């Protein structure tokens, strides 16, 4: 039944993106009459994979470790790198456990068990002592990628000895087992990334019916734009429409001078003749028809896949289409995990976790977030008056996606594995040159297609926004989150709906901050008031005349003048400060926005407010600016490809070389997506003493720490790895310590009881809204002896954490469903307080740096000891193999002072003056 999404019974076919890789998922086929059993090749002819059977690290399974094949249920045998064929044999369970790890098989009719079930793993292997990492969680296994590279990959970690990693250079074939009742519909899934992505997209797009209608309407909208534009160009007699010449009235009746629409429309034969007389128009129509057919085929294929996803939701997850809108994504994810734990869905030999699902859905998105964190995205253009302007239009983002991930000549080529050539440091120059030629080719293609794309952009904007502009002229003056904001403010492993919800909560305080913190411009305000007065007076006069006699509208350009005057008055009114925002403190508004944005575009110092305003204005920009960027995108995209991305080809290749890790069962992912504080933590974000990251390996702006904290709060059942778990424990211990210090000191004001007592509503959002009335951010004139304002936040954080851990205290008297529905709101409120608390500690440490490194280290850990020599990671070159000394990082070139020591033309070599300030050892 199902042969879509790369699924297809016993047919030998390649996956959607090519050969089967670590994401391929063979399903147990339907029982068939057993043909003559083919010879199942041993170690020399391909790895035998049964129920995701994988050999021990750096070893191969020998035929002697298996029992002789006997007649029984069919089993799936995978050979080579992905070609699959059926081998009808069975491996019985040994009667006596051997001394070595032996694979245990169950009959095909029974669902295999994993994790905590009684059935042992099929191919357990204990790693060598050099590969064991007792501090890491057994749920996260990361394999070595390139042993000779500068950036240390996360090694194979298998502390319990119950799992094994695939052989280096050999793909792992995880198995998807479906219960007996579903085997008629689910045969073979070859692309788990597409499978999980479509499961998420099906939920977010509200089911199959909405997806079908959305695709139909999009195809119909394309046809309408093309046909209606052609009709306006070739089928309308504008001389008759504008009454420049009399029309030929053929209808019977009295002659009248008014022109009707039918008089201006040409006959169909004449219209077709005028269309055929323009070869350019015919060529454009043919191209449009070809593009529409491609979109139609793509939509049909996707609809077949989504129909299968609907069957999976209904039969496997027990979520019918009519209940989909009332089921949150967290519930869908929990049912997926429960299905895998029960044996109904085995996509890998170890238990599936929330992080595995996010890694597959957000494989490429995490790379983009890391590129933005390292200053390679978005593209920036220097301004003549100083500073720079970021540019990331939809067209440029599509080109970047084609260059890096999904294009035919991209790095990933739409798959889950980075080619091995990019993992070798000796080919970086050749790969960078080849990628630079690809960028040049794509830029030339963009330049050739720019007239067509520009015409399409103009038509789409015209049809979409002109009516809105006439009805609501101030709509273009409204602000919205830019594409830059959605990239820079995004956490690692954050799904799109989570980002949208967070930015929606931050919109109102951020917009109010921009209105309040705008630099004073009395002359501009005075001119705007006068312009509003004169434009409004003229508009009022024309409006009164129109009401008195509607024939005034027949006067030439009267309606045009009224529209222009209304737009002018609305635009001028936007430059007048609102009176209700005059008395509000910008610091409180910025703090409220920070609680939901999680990243603060701010620099300490006397000019911090102006810089914060400019950077916030780039994140929350006017709609008119966004439309202008999209209109200019066809012309600017080739220039940015040539002058921004092509000169940075070597840096981008090095980025993927150093920040790609191979996770067993998942494939190649960005190392930042693991949220490993030890590898990518920053000492100024409470990870001092716990991170070994050099300057080039650190994630800027506390992205690793904040992403880890958000993910752990959003998924309470997820077990983080050892170093990340240690950081979370250290953070909570610091919160408890500061909360106890605040409660024990009676000299401080009772802000915590006041906030809690003033909040009359038990709902978390009401508590959080009441909390932001009190200033929590540290003052600008902080001194080393000033009282720590983070202690007040820690006290509040400890209080709300106790509420979150005790669901009975949420909405007392409410039903169980209401209490469960409020738990995500409590997690959001707790995350907001954690963000404020970490930013307070970070600002204190930044402002105390002039008084010495010792004072800065005290804020991040309770004790310190004499400094020790820098680690080898700091002495070796960061990312660079040529030993060159670059000038500065891309983030530093464009005015952002937080990021330092990166890579514009080679990569930064850590010198003595650039070593970490906090390298002292500390025992808790």
Swiss-Prot record:
Signal sequence coordinates: none
GO cellular component labels: autophagosome; endoplasmic reticulum membrane; Golgi membrane; phagophore assembly site; phagophore assembly site membrane; recycling endosome membrane; trans-Golgi network
Record keywords: Autophagy, Lipid transport, Membrane, Transmembrane, Transmembrane helix, Transport
Transmembrane segments: 208-228, 277-297, 527-547, 552-572
Molecular function GO labels: phospholipid scramblase activity
Annotated segments matching region Disordered: 1-144, 847-924
Tissue specificity statement from the Swiss-Prot or TrEMBL entry: Highly expressed in placenta (trophoblast cells) and pituitary gland. Not expressed in vascular endothelial.
Comment on protein domains: Forms a homotrimer with a solvated central pore, which is connected laterally to the cytosol through the cavity within each protomer. Acts as a lipid scramblase that uses its central pore to function: the central pore opens laterally to accommodate lipid headgroups, thereby enabling lipid flipping and redistribution of lipids added to the outer leaflet of ATG9B-containing vesicles, thereby enabling growth into autophagosomes.
Protein family: Belongs to the ATG9 family.
Name of this protein: Autophagy-related protein 9B
UniProt organism field: Homo sapiens
Organismal lineage: Eukaryota, Metazoa, Chordata, Craniata, Vertebrata
């Amino acid at each position: 039944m199902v042969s879509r999404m790369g699924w297809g019974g016993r047919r030998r076919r390649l996956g959607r993106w090519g050969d089967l890789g670590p994401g391929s998922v063979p399903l147990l086929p339907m029982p068939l009459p057993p043909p003559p059993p083919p010879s199942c090749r041993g170690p020399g002819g391909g790895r035998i994979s049964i129920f995701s059977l994988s050999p021990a690290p750096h070893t191969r399974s020998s035929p002697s470790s298996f029992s002789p094949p006997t007649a029984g249920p069919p089993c799936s045998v995978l050979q080579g790198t992905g070609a699959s064929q059926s081998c009808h044999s069975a491996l019985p369970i040994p009667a006596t456990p051997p001394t070595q790890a032996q694979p245990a098989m169950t009959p095909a009719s029974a669902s295999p068990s994993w994790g905590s079930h009684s059935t042992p793993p099929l191919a357990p292997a204990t790693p060598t002592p050099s590969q064991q990492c007792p501090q890491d969680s057994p749920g996260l296994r990361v394999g070595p990628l390139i042993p000779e590279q500068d950036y240390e990959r996360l090694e194979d970690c298998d502390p319990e000895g119950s799992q094994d990693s695939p052989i280096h250079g050999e793909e792992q074939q995880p198995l998807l087992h479906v219960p007996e009742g579903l085997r008629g519909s689910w045969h073979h899934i070859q692309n788990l990334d597409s499978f999980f992505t479509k499961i998420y997209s099906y939920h977010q797009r509200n089911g199959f019916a909405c997806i079908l209608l959305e695709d139909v309407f999009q195809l119909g909208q394309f046809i309408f734009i093309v046909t209606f534009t052609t009709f306006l160009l070739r089928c309308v007699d504008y001389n008759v429409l504008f009454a420049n010449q009399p029309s030929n009235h053929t209808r019977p009746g009295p002659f009248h001078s008014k022109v009707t629409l039918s008089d201006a429309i040409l006959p169909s034969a004449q219209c077709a003749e005028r269309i055929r007389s323009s070869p350019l128009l015919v060529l454009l129509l043919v191209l449009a028809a070809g593009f529409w057919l491609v979109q139609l085929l793509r939509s049909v294929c996707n609809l077949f896949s989504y129909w299968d996803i609907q069957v999976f939701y209904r039969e496997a997850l027990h979520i019918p289409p009519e209940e989909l809108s009332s089921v949150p994504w967290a519930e869908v994810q929990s049912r997926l995990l429960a299905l895998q734990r029960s044996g109904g869905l085995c996509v890998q030999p170890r238990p599936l976790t929330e992080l595995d699902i996010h890694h597959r859905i957000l494989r490429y998105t995490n790379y983009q977030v890391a590129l933005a964190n390292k200053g390679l995205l978005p593209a920036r253009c220097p301004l003549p008056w100083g500073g720079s302007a970021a540019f990331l239009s939809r067209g440029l983002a599509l080109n970047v996606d084609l260059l890096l991930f999904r294009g035919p000549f991209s790095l990933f080529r739409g798959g889950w594995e980075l080619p091995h050539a990019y993992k070798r440091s000796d080919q970086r120059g050749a790969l960078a040159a080849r990628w630079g030629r690809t960028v040049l080719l794509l830029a030339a293609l963009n330049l050739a297609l720019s007239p067509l794309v520009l015409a399409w952009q103009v038509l789409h904007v015209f049809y979409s926004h002109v009516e809105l502009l006439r009805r609501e002229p101030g709509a273009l003056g409204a602000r919205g989150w830019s594409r830059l904001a959605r990239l820079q403010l995004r956490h690692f492993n954050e799904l799109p709906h989570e980002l949208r919800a967070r930015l929606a909560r931050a919109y109102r305080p951020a917009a109010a901050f921009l209105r309040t913190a705008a630099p004073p411009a009395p002359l501009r305000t005075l001119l705007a008031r006068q312009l509003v007065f004169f434009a409004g007076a003229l508009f009022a006069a024309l409006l009164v005349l129109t009401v008195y006699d509607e024939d005034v509208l027949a006067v030439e350009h009267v309606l045009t003048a009224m529209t222009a005057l209304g737009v002018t008055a609305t635009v001028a009114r936007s430059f007048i400060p609102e009176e209700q925002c005059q008395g509000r403190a910008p610091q409180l508004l910025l703090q409220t926005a920070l609680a939901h944005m999680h990243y603060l575009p701010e620099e300490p110092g006397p000019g911090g407010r102006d810089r914060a305003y400019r950077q916030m204005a780039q994140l929350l920009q006017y709609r008119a600016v966004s439309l202008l960027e999209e209109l200019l995108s066809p012309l600017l995209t080739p220039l940015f490809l040539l002058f921004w991305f092509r000169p940075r080809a070597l840096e981008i290749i090095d980025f993927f070389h150093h920040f790609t890790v191979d996770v067993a069962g998942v494939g190649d992912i960005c190392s930042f997506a693991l949220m490993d504080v030890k590898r990518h933590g920053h000492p100024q974000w409470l990870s001092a003493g716990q991170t070994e990251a050099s300057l080039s390996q650190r994630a800027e702006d506390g992205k690793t720490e904040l992403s880890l904290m958000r993910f752990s709060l959003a998924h309470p059942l997820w077990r983080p790895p050892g170093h990340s778990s240690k950081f979370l424990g250290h953070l909570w211990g610091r919160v408890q310590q500061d909360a106890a210090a605040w409660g024990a000191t009676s000299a401080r004001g009772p802000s915590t009881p006041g906030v809690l007592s003033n909040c009359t509503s038990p709902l978390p959002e009401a508590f959080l809204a009441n909390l932001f009335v009190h200033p929590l951010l540290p003052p600008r004139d902080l001194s080393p002896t000033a009282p720590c304002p983070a202690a007040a936040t820690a006290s509040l954080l400890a209080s709300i954490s106790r509420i979150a851990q005790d669901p009975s205290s949420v909405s007392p008297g409410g039903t169980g469903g209401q209490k469960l529905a409020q738990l995500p709101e409590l997690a959001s409120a707790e995350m907001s307080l954690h963000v404020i608390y970490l930013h307070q500690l970070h600002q204190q440490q930044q402002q105390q740096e002039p008084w010495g490194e010792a004072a800065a280290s005290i804020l991040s850990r309770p004790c310190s000891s004499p400094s020790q020599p820098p680690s080898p990671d700091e002495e070796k070159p960061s990312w660079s193999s040529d030993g060159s000394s670059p000038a500065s990082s891309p983030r530093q070139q464009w005015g952002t002072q937080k990021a330092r020591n990166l890579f514009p033309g080679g990569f930064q070599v850590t010198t003595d003056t650039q070593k970490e300030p906090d390298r002292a050892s500390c025992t808790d």
